Amino acid sequence: MPRLFKIYAKNYFLTYPNCSLSKEEALSQLKKLETPTNKKYIKVCKELHENGEPHLHVLIQFEGKYQCKNQRFFDLVSPNRSAHFHPNIQAAKSSTDVKTYVEKDGNFIDFGVSQIDGRSARGGQQSANDAYAEALNSGSKSEALNILKEKAPKDYILQFHNLSSNLDRIFSPPLEVYVSPFLSSSFNQVPDELEEWVAENVVYSAARPWRPISIVIEGDSRTGKTMWARSLGPHNYLCGHLDLSPKVYSNDAWYNVIDDVDPHYLKHFKEFMGAQRDWQSNTKYGKPIQIKGGIPTIFLCNPGPTSSYREYLDEEKNISLKNWALKNATFVTLYEPLFASINQGPTQDSQEETNKA
């Protein structure tokens, strides 16, 4: 009695000998196969053997173990002629090894997200690597920590601080892109000196001066400072408290906006105002953060001893800092709003009131 065909595995390695299909056509057909377990990743490689025959090698990674009882299930069909291509089907003991083999000639195409495998057929099972691979594939920091707590308890206890910090970086969500409710053209009473500063300094990196000039804008609340500053392009917005973590601060921004921060307590005063490059910020509970820098900063403030940068720099103890600041920043005082109220919607006041700019 013939032996029944059955493979139960999470990773499948398929080889199609003498297969004339393109890798794109093969991938398209494999993606359409209906399985009870989701396909997380497919890699298709085309290889020419020494005799000139084309072969296809395929790695398929499923979300969970998939049981295949039909040895014709993975057959491919030629779209141009009545030809079927039947593969050799194996369970991949190490998807890492198979993936390396499939990629060796560089002629491949893939779909989905490759799942990390801690095992290697050459090195045997590595339980610690398996645990970390499973954690990386989990999709979130909390799930990853739970996996490591269960499967790598020693590391969980002794290295929790490092694990937590590293997983924050690995699973950090993409920064939300701020969309201004107003176009910069909505601000129709912007002084010429502000317009000129923007034209020279708020530009993409290739057009930006090596050491751009920052600007300090002082004025009463509800003059449109914040909304105008945030309408100019991709920026980092720091209000009240400076958070330079990757969750908030982007090294790809065109400029910074520092809003309503008392200059007496502004950390990295010179780094921001001087558009300095490649500097570090020490965090209280984490590793130092590397800031690429080289971008200008817009400082927004109200008049008064705890807000005004002019008043702060006029203090006798800050005379040398003032001399430096005058070479690195433009100082502008607003006496009128940057907009004509007839052109602004009702959100202007509410936003300005929130930021107290």
Swiss-Prot record:
Stretch forming the signal peptide: none
Cofactor: record remark: Divalent metal cations, possibly Mg(2+) or Mn(2+).
A biological-process GO annotation: DNA replication
Binding positions for ATP per the UniProt entry: 219-226
GO MF annotation, one: endodeoxyribonuclease activity, producing 5'-phosphomonoesters
Location in or out of the cell: Host nucleus
Region (Oligomerization) residue spans: 154-174
S-S pairs: none
Domain notes per entry: There are 3 rolling circle replication (RCR) motifs. RCR-2 is probably involved in metal coordination. RCR-3 is required for phosphodiester bond cleavage for initiation of RCR.
Function: Essential for the replication of viral ssDNA. The closed circular ssDNA genome is first converted to a superhelical dsDNA. Rep binds a specific region at the genome origin of replication. It introduces an endonucleolytic nick within the conserved sequence 5'-TAATATTAC-3' in the intergenic region of the genome present in all geminiviruses, thereby initiating the rolling circle replication (RCR). Following cleavage, binds covalently to the 5'-phosphate of DNA as a tyrosyl ester. The cleavage gives rise to a free 3'-OH that serves as a primer for the cellular DNA polymerase.
Domain CRESS-DNA virus Rep endonuclease residues, every copy: 6-114
Matches recorded under SUPFAM superfamilies: Origin of replication-binding domain, RBD-like
Family designation: Belongs to the geminiviridae Rep protein family.
Subunit: Homooligomer. Interacts with the replication enhancer protein (REn). Interacts with host retinoblastoma-related protein 1 (RBR1), and may thereby induce the transcription of host replicative enzymes even if the cell is not dividing anymore. Interacts with host PCNA. Interacts with host SCE1 protein.
UniProt KW keywords: ATP-binding, Covalent protein-DNA linkage, DNA replication, DNA-binding, Endonuclease, Helicase, Host nucleus, Host-virus interaction, Hydrolase, Metal-binding, Multifunctional enzyme, Nuclease, Nucleotide-binding, Nucleotidyltransferase, Transferase
Motif (RCR-1): 13-16
Motif (RCR-2): 55-57
Protein name from the UniProt record: Replication-associated protein
